[in-house]
Amino acid sequence: FKMAIPIWLKEKLFQKDLLRKQFKKFDPDFDWMNKLLFSEHHFSHAASAFFPSPFEEACVLTMDGVGEWATTSVALGQGSKLEMTKEIHFPHSLGLLYSALTYYTGFRVNSGEYKVMGLAPYGEPKYADLIRDNLIDIKEDGSFRLDQKYFDYCTGLAMTNRHFDDLFGGPARTAEEL
């Protein structure tokens, strides 16, 4: 939590006010402060998956980089209700782990992940044990924790650090050109 505060203050704290001010430019007379509603990131993902589905009841798993604080969530959908039952919070994120690997292999974060996914079937799982043994602690209940000594994404400066480089045998590849 302490590591994430600088990024949260910069990126998230004033986001709602910023959006309301921008919308006010379009229609200054509309009551944006009271009419504009916000839902949590993972709740929105879960709702968009469950409500249009043909299922009356379902367990909905959402995993990505990070929403407000949640990175992984489990929701139970029943009829017209959706209840979040479990969450894993930042900085522990499979999405950010994937982005760190994307960064390390020389692709741009938030745009190169699909390339890594597309190349994955052509590779060998030679780093799977290394990742499981060092980067992630998978708990018996399926939850997980990332060992933060290998990552720098909490500072917003880089995805990985020298410990990550040492673990994988060298520095990250230079980012791809535009």
Residue ranges and their predicted role:
Residues F1-L178:
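Short acidic/glycine-rich loops and adjacent helix/strand connectors
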